[in-house]
């Protein structure tokens, strides 16, 4: 079979774009905590010494946005100008307006009710925008995620962990990881290259201190976890590149401006699946960019967990103000155990993909989003990540005739 290399990347919570994502979702959580019906679309820009928050919100809740911003920045680890940013002293600018009544009309009273007179409660809420969303799952890891993004996220999480627990005390919050894996056909067989770039204190020698510490306490630690998880991958002789520029002292918002929604491939499947283009952070679940993408992950993961396919990508599409999806597409890449049309029909029978039904079934009107904003929205089986449940396996198998 043909051999090929596939690469995915991740970033730490201290990357400027991820700081912005976490701030946006922290504000969302604060509003949902007081008013679960809040409509929120919050964007964050972060640059040297300044955080600017803008967007549209309709809510009965109050949020002390400057205080939320500062606490989140400090929690991430930016507490000194020596690190390039200080949450205690940075400026915070807020420009929040109300949601457009034209959008609210379509969300609050869907096309099905306004035009067709439908009285079904779940038909009353329309999609918050038009758009297309993808979900993906495969059997490369126990979490049914692609292996390259799985490993890249683990490396990024570990990079932050060794900084926070003092194992590598001279690290700073900003960091990136990248993983290249060799595939034989569709099977991951060998780790080819690992890239780790981490912000660090001044006067740290790359060759004698940083690179050996990263190899021992970050990379080898993660590779040992893969073995514990039963993932078979040849890791002998992999290439490790640590801070290939030679130095990474200036980082965080001082090194690069950060924006909400700039890491959508890292947030999802690391490039292994297609993406509809919509970002997640700062958006309440009436926005199908977020809620339907979560639902598609739920669908695809249940399809693979049910044994209907080894790889599954699902696309859904919506029209603004309409409850029912306008399109559903299933791709199994030649791995289906039954006819793909049967899988598509089974999905339609088992899953209700109207926005109100997604919000109900995944219990999305909760303050759960800040924890999604770093290290991936998918593949982490945390209690609040309801879209990672495989609770429709039996129903799918029955509907597909297995």
UniProtKB/Swiss-Prot annotation:
One of its GO terms (biological process) is one-carbon metabolic process. ATP binds at residues 15, 174-176, 247-248, 256, 262-263, 279, 283. Residues 99-109 are annotated as: Flexible loop. The keyword Cytoplasm applies. Its cofactor is Mg(2+); K(+). Its EC number is 2.5.1.6. InterPro entries: ADOMET_SYNTHASE_CS, S-AdoMet_synt_C, S-AdoMet_synt_central, S-AdoMet_synt_N, S-AdoMet_synthetase, S-AdoMet_synthetase_sfam. Pathway: Amino-acid biosynthesis; S-adenosyl-L-methionine biosynthesis; S-adenosyl-L-methionine from L-methionine: step 1/1. It is found in: Cytoplasm. GO terms for molecular function: ATP binding; magnesium ion binding; methionine adenosyltransferase activity. It is an enzyme of class 2 (transferase). The keyword Nucleotide-binding applies. Mg(2+) binds at residue 17. K(+) binds at residue 43. CDD domains: S-AdoMet_synt (cd18079). GO terms for cellular component: cytoplasm. Keywords: ATP-binding, Cytoplasm, Magnesium, Metal-binding, Nucleotide-binding, One-carbon metabolism, Potassium, Transferase. Homotetramer; dimer of dimers. Belongs to the AdoMet synthase family. This is S-adenosylmethionine synthase. It comes from Streptomyces griseus subsp. griseus (strain JCM 4626 / CBS 651.72 / NBRC 13350 / KCC S-0626 / ISP 5235).
């Amino acid at each position: 079979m043909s051999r090929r290399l596939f690469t995915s990347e991740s970033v730490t919570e201290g990357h400027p774009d991820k700081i912005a994502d976490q701030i946006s979702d922290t504000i969302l959580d604060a509003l949902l905590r007081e008013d679960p019906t809040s409509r929120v679309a919050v964007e964050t820009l972060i640059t040297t010494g300044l955080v600017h928050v803008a967007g549209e919100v309709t809510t009965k809740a109050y949020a002390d946005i400057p205080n939320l911003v500062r606490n989140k920045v400090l929690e991430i680890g930016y507490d000194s100008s020596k690190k390039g940013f200080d949450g205690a002293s940075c400026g915070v600018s807020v420009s929040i307006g109300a949601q457009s009544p034209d959008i609210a009309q379509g969300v609050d009273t869907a096309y099905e009710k306004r035009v067709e007179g439908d009285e079904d409660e779940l038909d009353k809420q329309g999609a918050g925008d038009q758009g297309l969303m993808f979900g993906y799952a495969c059997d490369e890891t126990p979490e049914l995620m692609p292996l390259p993004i799985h490993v890249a996220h683990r490396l990024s999480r570990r990079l932050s962990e060794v900084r926070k627990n003092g194992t590598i005390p001279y690290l700073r919050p900003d960091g990136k990881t990248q993983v290249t894996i060799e595939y034989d056909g569709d099977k991951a067989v060998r780790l080819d290259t690992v890239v780790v770039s981490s912000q660090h204190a001044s006067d740290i020698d790359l060759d004698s201190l940083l690179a050996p510490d990263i190899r021992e306490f970050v990379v080898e630690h993660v590779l040992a976890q893969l073995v514990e998880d039963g993932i078979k991958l040849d890791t002998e002789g992999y290439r490790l590149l640590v801070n290939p520029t030679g130095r990474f002292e200036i980082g965080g918002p001082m090194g690069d401006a950060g924006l909400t929604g700039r890491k959508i491939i890292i947030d999802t499947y690391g490039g292994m699946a297609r993406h509809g283009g919509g970002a997640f952070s700062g958006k309440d679940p009436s926005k199908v960019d977020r809620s339907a993408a979560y639902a598609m992950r739920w669908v695809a993961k249940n399809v693979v967990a049910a044994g209907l396919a080894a790889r599954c990508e699902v696309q859904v599409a919506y029209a603004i103000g309409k409850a029912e999806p306008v399109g559903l597409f299933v791709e199994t890449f030649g791995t289906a155990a039954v006819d793909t049309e049967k899988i598509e029909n089974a999905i339609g029978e088992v899953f209700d993909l109207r926005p109100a039904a997604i919000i109900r079934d995944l219990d999305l009107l909760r303050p759960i989003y800040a924890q999604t904003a770093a290290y991936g929205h998918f593949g982490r089986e945390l209690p609040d990540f309801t879209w990672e449940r495989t609770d429709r396996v039996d129903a799918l198998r029955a509907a597909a005739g297995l």
